[in-house]
Amino acid sequence: MQNIFNKIYESKSLNQEESYQLFKSIALGKINEIQLSSILTAMQMHGESEKEILGAIYAFSERMKFFPRPNYIFSDIVGTGGDSKNTINVSTSSAFVAASCGFKIIKHCNKGVSSKSGSSDLLNKFKINLNTSLENSKKILDKLNICFLFAPKYHSVFKYASKTRSILKIKTIFNLLGPFLNPSRPPLTLIGVYKKDLVNPMSRILKKLKYQRGIILHGDDTDEVTLHGTTYISELLNNKIYSYELEPEDFGIKRHSKSIFVEYSPEENYHIIKKTMQGKGEKLHEELIAVNVALLLKIFGHENLKENTKIALKKIRSGDVYKHIMQVSNMLKED
């Protein structure tokens, strides 16, 4: 193991087997906090490679508690976080909109580590019980098209890194692993990444993990589709990878000024999303969520982004999404 440590400290990338062995040791609690802190920092500084990410995924997958895979098509939508922007929680909001439109979503969620508000932080504000039983999660998915799998419930090995990550408060390889470790093993996924250089390597990982269809995206320094610049896409379709760029106009949306960018606290994030889902939000937030939903619907086979955006906006402005959120919350209270 010392040879692996030395390689990392010398800013050399590990091969897949070395990464697998390292993260297997982390999963078994054999790496102490000081070692882990230096490893994660060094890997982040030289940039995590495709082989390092894959090796870590395989190591943690072996110790993951699986969620029974439904016999219908479903997707995840998730951002890596780590873009330091602390914008509203777009992926969770988009998941609710898609579910309200009739699409099945199993969202892998966690607390915010490198951002102010993770998906589970927002869900707790909506009084959505993340400690519900596996059976009840499946029941809600069947009836209301969505369920949430809280990472600590399915990945006991994460506990060995949680303290170190919370102290570091920086993006690490763990930001890149979570999107590929959904316990339901979705055939479809939409993943936003915090830097453009990750788009192509992450799409190759989708292919190696045998996803049916998926999109990796990065939009102007954020892990979501952007309204004020170019969104870079790498899409896995029919076992081939296609790279392209999208502009706001491709969604039928007028470009917004970059000056509108604002950081939000967890409380502000919740109130903005609540208001938006009630159909009383600002145009910026409505459209930001809608374009991300549009891309999510694309991987379900609905290829027209402009039409998808219209569908999402109509659903958001109707207030039906908030009613759907409350249905999920109330059904989970019965557990």
From Swiss-Prot:
Q: Where does Mg(2+) 2 bind?
A: 223-224
- Say which enzyme class the record assigns: transferase
**UniProt binding sites for Mg(2+) 1:** 91, 224
On cofactor binding, the record's note says: Binds 2 magnesium ions per monomer.
Q: Might you give the EC number(s) for this enzyme?
A: 2.4.2.18
| Cross-referenced InterPro entries | Anthranilate_Pribosyl_Tfrase, Glycosyl_Trfase_fam3, Glycosyl_Trfase_fam3_N_dom, Glycosyl_Trfase_fam3_N_dom_sf, Nuc_phospho_transferase
Query: Keywords on this record?
Result: Amino-acid biosynthesis, Aromatic amino acid biosynthesis, Glycosyltransferase, Magnesium, Metal-binding, Transferase, Tryptophan biosynthesis
Q: Which GO terms describe its biological process?
A: L-tryptophan biosynthetic process
Q: Does the keyword Amino-acid biosynthesis apply?
A: yes
Q: Which residues bind 5-phospho-alpha-D-ribose 1-diphosphate?
A: 79, 82-83, 87, 89-92, 107-115, 119
Q: Cofactor(s) for this protein?
A: Mg(2+)
Which Gene Ontology terms of cellular component type are present? cytosol
Pathway noted in the entry: Amino-acid biosynthesis; L-tryptophan biosynthesis; L-tryptophan from chorismate: step 2/5
Q: Which GO terms describe its molecular function?
A: anthranilate phosphoribosyltransferase activity; magnesium ion binding
Q: Which residues bind anthranilate 2?
A: 165
Q: What does this protein do?
A: Catalyzes the transfer of the phosphoribosyl group of 5-phosphorylribose-1-pyrophosphate (PRPP) to anthranilate to yield N-(5'-phosphoribosyl)-anthranilate (PRA).
Q: Supply the NCBIfam families for this chain.
A: trpD (TIGR01245)
| Subunit composition and interactions | Homodimer.
Which family does the record assign? Belongs to the anthranilate phosphoribosyltransferase family.
Please give the name of this protein. Answer: Anthranilate phosphoribosyltransferase
User: Which species does this protein come from?
Assistant: Buchnera aphidicola subsp. Schizaphis graminum (strain Sg)
